[in-house]
């Protein structure tokens, strides 16, 4: 049973990582909008690695009488996957900072478009079950920094940005498995002229489990952005979520 619990915790370990994407979900742009970012990761004693992340918005559907859109970040790993793929969250486009900070619980549906195992979707009930089992709790703050304004280079030009402090903490404390605390602490440079509002973000990501402490430094910098006509085809929702398939068939 302890081994099974450890496997499930591995699967849910990606859920707290949504904390780093919530700063992009505030007041989403119109469907068809996209932006790409360079993501650099630095680990102690290792060379810095670089990858490109893409954020986009596609038409969604009404949920409880409210319009929703698909907010997608790609490519990322999700729920213990070995593969990186688009992760799409069905959310309201008009979320303010408070609602965006609760990105997980404010998602009406989540689709992970695994290119090897196939797509699957999670309902609100699925997410609630996972987070309840893991005893997931989190806090999130985005507050004015000093200096309050700063000009930086991003997206090929100088940008006058609002500078904010980011502090987010997520805790998982499931039965039979060691408690894990993940802390994001850093700076976000916001520019209202950028589609997702973020020109750059730099943060330290610290994971504490038992006596083990891991620290990474991550930097996201805007590369490009634009708009293209949204696809008329709906997102492939794939299979329904299954925790057993997740654990034994990742």
Where are these regions (language model features)?
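Sec-dependent N-terminal signal peptides
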Residues: 3-14
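Acidic, serine/threonine-rich low-complexity disordered tracts
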Residues: 20-106, 111-250
